[in-house]
Structure formats: C-alpha cells, structure tokens
C-alpha cells in the first residue's frame, strides 16, 4: 500500500485539483462580490455548520475514536468537483457551485488543519495532536491542493483553447482516479472492512442527509433563491473524498481513520441523485 499512499494518492489528488483549476476564471472569484449573501451562506454552511453537525454526531454516536476522527476528516474536506455537475442536473446555480468549490478548496489549507486540530482537542485525543504538526499539515495541503489549482488556472489563462478542450477529459480522468483511490482504501482494510462499514456507514448516512437538509433550509431561511438553495445543499452533501483519504493517510497512517470516507463517498452520490430527482420532479409538477 506504500506505493499507493506515498506516490499515487498525492498525484491523483494533485491532478484532480489541477482539473478543477482548468475550469476556473477570474469571474469565479469575483462572484464573492457579486453574490456575497449566496456565497457566504454556502461557505458558512460548509465550513462551520457541517463540522459542527459532524462533531455533535460523533459525540453521541457509539463509535471508536479512530472512526470519529475519520468522520471529522470527511466533514472538514471541501466540496467535491462533481458537485458542479450534479448542481447542473438539479437546475441549481452552477456558477455559485464552481465558486464555492474553488474558494473553499483553496481555503482548505487553513480550514482543514484548524477543524481537525480543534476536533482532536475536543474529542480528548491530545496524544494524537502532539504527533501532528500544524505547519507540515498546511504545507502538505498547500502543495497538493493549492499549487495544482493555481497551475490549472495559469494554464487556462495562457492556453485557454487547449485548456477548454482538455478540461472535460481531465474531469473524466479525475473521476477514474477517485474510484481507484476509493477502491485502494477499501482493499487496504479488506480484513476489517465489514465491521468498519457497519460501524461507520450509518453515521455517515445520517451526517450526509442531515447536512443537506440543514443547508437547504438555512439557505431558505436566509433568503437565497431556489437555484442557490439547491446548489448549497449539494455542496454540503458532496465532499472531496480523495482529499479526506489523503489527509487520513498522511496524518494518521490510514486504517480506521480513512474508513468513514469510503461509505460517505458512496452514499453522497446516491443521496445527491435522489435530491436531484426530487427537486427536478418538484419543478416539473
């Protein structure tokens, strides 16, 4: 598994983030100014509410400390790149989805370490915290997440036609890489996979559904439009599973720490597709 975790996993994540960068332009970042309320409702839901809901669940749920930390890792991860596609299927605000995914992914260099260190302290895992360097965690994420996104954006800026042509293919490769990483994580724990899925599967299902519902109604309460509500709900339901597995592997050595990312990564597509079907049916009726 060392070749997979030491070489393939970081390269796969870097390519996925590069593919994200290929699709970004300056307007995706200016949307924070043009649609400040919609953006900040989405960002707060994902960066603050999602980890809080996850933390409450792991505190009341009878799971091991390792699995609890694994749940917090997936909750701390930014939105997945496929959220843009599913937002489109749901007839949501795709432009807002792209902005949320891009900016929160870039902010993850700060938010993920902060959320994880805070969670470990609150969960009483001080011994684990002592073995983690906040600086090295942020630096690793900067190199694997931020730098590839910036490279993708630069490529788009100076070779736009080539970037546009390659973007669709790159996103397909990203999906394949994500599946390979997910299967690798599952196979690495094949001896314990059934018990892990039994322990972590239901809590990740509850977290996913609960957060999509909360995000949808928080957005409604704060007066965002219907397309924006759909977008924010999907953004809070689809997390970057590859990044979660990378963090769990590099910081905690894999094992039970990365297991919650596996069922969550499967569940989130099912629940998101159900959500898409429901909102499209509602729109047509």
Which sequence ranges carry the predicted segments?
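Alpha-helical transmembrane segments of multi-pass small-molecule/ion transporters
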Residues: 1-285
């Amino acid at each position: 598994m060392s070749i997979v975790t030491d070489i393939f996993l970081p390269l796969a994540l870097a390519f996925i983030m590069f593919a994200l960068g290929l699709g970004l332009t300056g307007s995706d970042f200016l949307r924070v100014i043009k649609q400040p309320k919609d953006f900040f409702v989405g960002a707060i839901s994902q960066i603050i509410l999602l980890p809080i809901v996850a933390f409450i669940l792991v505190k009341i749920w009878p799971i091991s400390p390792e699995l609890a930390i694994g749940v917090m890792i997936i909750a701390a991860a930014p939105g997945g790149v496929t959220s843009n596609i599913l937002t489109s299927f749901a007839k949501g605000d795709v432009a807002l989805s792209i902005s949320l995914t891009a900016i929160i992914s870039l902010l993850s260099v700060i938010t993920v370490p902060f959320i994880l260190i805070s969670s470990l302290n609150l969960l009483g895992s001080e011994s684990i915290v002592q073995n983690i360097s906040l600086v090295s965690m942020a630096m690793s994420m900067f190199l694997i997440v931020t730098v590839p996104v910036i490279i993708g954006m630069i490529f788009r800026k100076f070779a736009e036609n080539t970037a546009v042509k390659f973007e669709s293919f790159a996103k397909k490769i990203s999906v394949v890489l994500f599946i390979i990483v997910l299967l690798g994580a599952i196979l690495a724990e094949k001896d314990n996979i059934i018990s892990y899925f039994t322990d972590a599967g239901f809590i990740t299902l509850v977290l996913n559904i609960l957060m999509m519902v909360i995000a949808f109604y928080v957005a409604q309460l704060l007066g965002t439009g219907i397309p924006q509500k759909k977008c924010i709900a999907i953004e809070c339901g689809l997390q970057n599973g590859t990044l979660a597995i990378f963090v769990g592997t590099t910081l905690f050595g894999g094992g039970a720490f990365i297991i919650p990312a596996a069922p969550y990564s499967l569940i989130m597509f099912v629940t998101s597709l159900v959500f898409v079907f429901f909102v499209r049916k509602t729109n047509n009726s």
